Amino acid sequence: MKHPITYLFAVLSMFALFSGAALADTYEGRTKCSSCHKSQAKSWKDTAHAKAMESLKPGTRKEAKVKAKLDPEKDYTQDKDCVGCHVDGFGKKGGYTIEAAKKPLAAVGCESCHGPGKNYRGDHRKAGQAFESKGTTTQRKVVADKGQDFHFEESCNACHLNYEGSPWKGAKPPYTPFTPSVDEKYTFTFDKMVKDVKAMHEHYKLDGSFTGEPKFKYHDEFQASAKVPEKGAKKGKGKDE
C-alpha cells in the first residue's frame, strides 16, 4: 500500500493537471460574443480583420502578394504557415483547423484579442446579469483568471511584428512576408493601431459590470468617447475592453 502522503500528493497532482486542462485554450467562435455585443460585432464586420480569410484566396490582393513574393493565384487558405494569422485559435484547443474549418472561427475575431471564451464566458454573463438585477459589480480578475485577456498587445504583435529582423523579441518562424521593407504600410505600432476603429471596431458604452484590475490601458480613454450601443444590444453581458 502506498504511503498516505505519497497518495495525497498523487491526488493533488492529478487535480492540478485536470484543472489546468480544463482551463486550456478553448475557442467558441465570435457568434457567442456577438449574441450580446451586437454593436461591436456589426462594426467589426467592416474591418480587415473580419475579411482576413478572404485575403488568402486566389486572385485577391494580387499587388500585395506579388510585392511579398507570393503567388497571387495560389489558395493560401490551406497553408498552415499562413492561416494562423487569419483565423481564431489556429493550432490551439477548440481553435480553427484546416481539416474541419468552422465559419465562426474563420476570421480574426473577438477571441484573437480577448482570449478563448469557453472558460470565462459563463462568469462574464453572470457578471452582467448581477449588475443588471442588483447593481453588483464583479472584479475583472474573476474572468481574467479564466482566460479573458485584458492586455492583448502580444497577440497583435504575434502576427503584425512576426518577421525576420523584427524589433519584437517574440518573432519566430513561420515569419510573415508582409514587412515594412516590402511596404511601409506594414509598419506596426500597437498604441497607434489599437485606436484605429477601422482596423479594430467602434467602441460602445459599457454599463460598468466590471471593476478593478487588470484593466486595458486605454479602457477609460475609449469609454470617454464611446458610442451608445444600438437599441436592443445588451450592454452588460459581454466582453469588457
Question: Where do the model's predicted regions map?
Answer:
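Bacterial N-terminal signal peptides that target proteins for export
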Residues: 1-11
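Sec/Tat signal peptide C-region and signal peptidase I cleavage site
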Residues: 5, 15-24
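Short, low-complexity polar/charged micro-motifs in intrinsically disordered terminal tails
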Residues: 14-15, 237
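Sequence context of c-type cytochrome heme-c attachment sites
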Residues: 20-106, 111, 117-149, 181-241
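Substrate-binding/catalytic groove segments of enzymes
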Residues: 119-121, 164-174
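A conserved mid-domain beta-alpha-beta active-site/ligand-binding segment of alpha/beta enzyme cores
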Residues: 156-159
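Secondary-shell segments that build the walls of catalytic and ion/ligand-binding clefts
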Residues: 176-179
